[in-house]
């Protein structure tokens, strides 16, 4: 992520979680490699794939993401941040 000054912003999610979410997206989207800032929709994501990922996040991490929040997040990094917030009870 970049701030308005062009500096890279640090994610509040652990790098390992971001990697796990990137791998999950790759698995569900049939993509060979998904980067932490890759856009879900640019990768070919759609509503069915989004629901599958949301369900897997609930199963694997115990965090229920809303469809709206998932679609607004758009990247593995931001989804990982939502998972961290959910784990913290925010």
Where are the predicted features?
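Phosphopantetheine-dependent thiolation modules in NRPS/PKS and related acyl-activating systems
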Residues: 1-90
């Amino acid at each position: 992520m970049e701030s308005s000054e062009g500096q890279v912003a640090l994610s509040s999610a652990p790098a390992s979680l971001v990697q796990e979410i990137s791998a999950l997206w790759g698995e569900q989207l049939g993509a060979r490699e998904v980067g932490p800032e890759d856009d879900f929709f640019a990768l070919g994501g759609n509503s069915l794939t989004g629901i599958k990922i949301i369900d897997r996040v609930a199963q694997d991490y115990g965090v229920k993401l809303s469809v709206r929040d998932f679609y607004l997040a758009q990247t593995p990094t931001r989804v990982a941040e939502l998972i961290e917030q959910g784990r913290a009870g925010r």
